[in-house]
Amino acid sequence: MECELVDLSNNNVGSVELNPLIFSAKQKLSILHDIVRWQLAKRRVGAHKTKGISDVSGTTAKPYGQKRTGRARQGSLRSPQFRGGGIIFGPVVRSHAYSLNKKVRKFGLKIALSLKYLNNQVVVLDSLNVDVKKTSKMCEYIKNFKFSSFLIVGDYGDDLLRAAKNLHYVDLIKPIGLNVFDILNHECVMLTKDTLKHLEGRLL
């Protein structure tokens, strides 16, 4: 699978071979769905919390005698039926993360990259070694590509990161951090030659 190799100005500088095991995987959208749910569950903070009967402040004394009052028996003023009482079975601080098979995660990454390649939304860059320090200069480069949002994957410098930081439609990510959710969340995926080598070592 041969793909055009371009620079950030979208000028052709050669060609590069794409591994068909990564960029022509069988499409199984159910796996993408499972992985996106897994990623979103992992990133949930889970900081919701209500006070239970043991957390609310108040006396522990029995409010009145068990018998001879004619009222329903009560053992605590912190019970949920009283004003200011605790919440029963309320949310507690917890992790929403769950495990997902490593083979499934690898396969999902192949499916996502194949889907982008199938829709002509993969761009292979020769490198990210460009002198970009201003956001305006980064905008000039990005305008050479006719897409609405970009995920740039490669080993970038601090200057390039700073230049792209203020563009809401451009995200930079290291090859080790490439994931299904970010791939699907951007229209165009830009990969460097070095990233392709990294993916072969990671996914094959």
Swiss-Prot record:
Residues 56-79 are annotated as: Disordered. One of its GO terms (biological process) is translation. One of its GO terms (cellular component) is ribosome. Keywords: Ribonucleoprotein, Ribosomal protein, RNA-binding, rRNA-binding. Pfam families: Ribosomal_L4. The keyword Ion transport does not apply. One of its GO terms (molecular function) is rRNA binding. InterPro entries: Ribosomal_uL4, Ribosomal_uL4-like, Ribosomal_uL4_dom_sf. Transmembrane segments: none annotated. Part of the 50S ribosomal subunit. Belongs to the universal ribosomal protein uL4 family. HAMAP family: Ribosomal_uL4_B. One of the primary rRNA binding proteins, this protein initially binds near the 5'-end of the 23S rRNA. It is important during the early stages of 50S assembly. It makes multiple contacts with different domains of the 23S rRNA in the assembled 50S subunit and ribosome. This is Large ribosomal subunit protein uL4. It comes from Wolbachia pipientis subsp. Culex pipiens (strain wPip).
